[in-house]
């Protein structure tokens, strides 16, 4: 009986130790698995949260010091000035060319009237001659008005040219590349255009002067002939 109790006691002890050996790894694995399951969501949360944080933080753009420099701002401003002065110059050039053209037409109209009057000298009575002269006087007044108008516009145009030249020089001094070249080319172009219409008006004025000289010559000749006829008649009467 004592031997049986001793054997049972040893068996129970061995069984307990065996179960303890089996339970320790299981518990350890369970704890490790639980810790792993516990830490995994936190790791994901931290990772996702960190990513969201990075997305939420604004990334500052790299500044461009050259585009914000005083020199660049001056070049930009002077480019606007050259554009504005070029527009002003274009408008005044157009107005001046139109005014000179209208003046040239008025000169040719007066020239035509002078020539017609010259061709009719000696063929008109005093009333008809007065009527023709009234038309000539009106045409001359129209020509004078057109001339004054274009001279006034020419003063404005010269001011526009001066402004454009100063703007081009300012653009050159600030280091702008294209603005001064464009402005100077534009100035040269409008000067050529104005000079062309000036040549046409001077040609018309020359024609008018020739017509006036011819009219004066014809009138002087006619008056001389009339005087000679009068003297001849007087001489014949004396005889």
Curated annotation (Swiss-Prot):
Transit peptide per record: 1-22
Record's subcellular location: Mitochondrion; Cytoplasm, Cytosol
Region feature (Disordered): 217-239
Motif IAP-binding, chain ranges: 56-60
GO annotation, cellular component aspect: cytosol; mitochondrion
Signal sequence bounds: none
PTM text: Ubiquitinated by BIRC7/livin. Ubiquitinated by BIRC6.
Organism domain of life: Eukaryota
Site feature location: Cleavage: 55-56
Pfam family, one: Smac_DIABLO
GO BP field: intrinsic apoptotic signaling pathway in response to oxidative stress; neuron apoptotic process
Sorted UniProt keywords: Apoptosis, Cytoplasm, Mitochondrion, Transit peptide, Ubl conjugation
Function field: Promotes apoptosis by activating caspases in the cytochrome c/Apaf-1/caspase-9 pathway. Acts by opposing the inhibitory activity of inhibitor of apoptosis proteins (IAP). Inhibits the activity of BIRC6/BRUCE by inhibiting its binding to caspases.
Similarity field: Belongs to the Smac/DIABLO protein family.
Domain notes: The mature N-terminus mediates interaction with XIAP/BIRC4.
Subunit record text: Homodimer. Interacts with BEX3. Interacts with BIRC2/c-IAP1 (via BIR3 domain). Interacts with BIRC6/BRUCE. Interacts with BIRC7/livin. Interacts with XIAP/BIRC4 (via BIR3 domain). Interacts with the monomeric and dimeric form of BIRC5/survivin. Interacts with AREL1 (via HECT domain); in the cytoplasm following induction of apoptosis.
Protein name per the record: Diablo IAP-binding mitochondrial protein
Native species: Pongo abelii
Taxonomic lineage: Eukaryota, Metazoa, Chordata, Craniata, Vertebrata
């Amino acid at each position: 009986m004592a031997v049986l109790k001793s054997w049972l006691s040893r068996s129970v002890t061995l069984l307990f130790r065996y179960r303890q050996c089996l339970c320790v790894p299981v518990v350890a694995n369970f704890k490790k698995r639980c810790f792993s399951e516990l830490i995994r969501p936190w790791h994901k949360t931290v990772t996702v949260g960190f990513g969201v944080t990075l997305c939420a933080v604004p990334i500052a753009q790299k500044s461009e010091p050259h585009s914000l420099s005083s020199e660049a701002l001056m070049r930009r401003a002077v480019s606007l000035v050259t554009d504005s002065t070029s527009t002003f110059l274009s408008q005044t050039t157009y107005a001046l060319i139109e005014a000179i053209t209208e003046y040239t037409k008025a000169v040719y109209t007066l020239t035509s009237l002078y020539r017609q009057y010259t061709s009719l000298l000696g063929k008109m009575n005093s009333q008809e001659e007065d009527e023709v002269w009234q038309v000539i006087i009106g045409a001359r007044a129209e020509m004078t008005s057109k001339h004054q108008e274009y001279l006034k516009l020419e003063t404005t145009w010269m001011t526009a040219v001066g402004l454009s030249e100063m703007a081009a020089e300012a653009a050159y001094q600030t280091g702008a590349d294209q603005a001064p070249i464009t402005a100077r080319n534009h100035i040269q172009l409008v000067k050529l255009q104005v000079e062309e219409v000036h040549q046409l008006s001077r040609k018309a004025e020359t024609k008018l002067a020739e017509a006036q000289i011819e009219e004066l010559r014809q009138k002087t000749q006619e008056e001389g002939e009339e005087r000679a006829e009068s003297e001849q008649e007087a001489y014949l009467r004396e005889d």
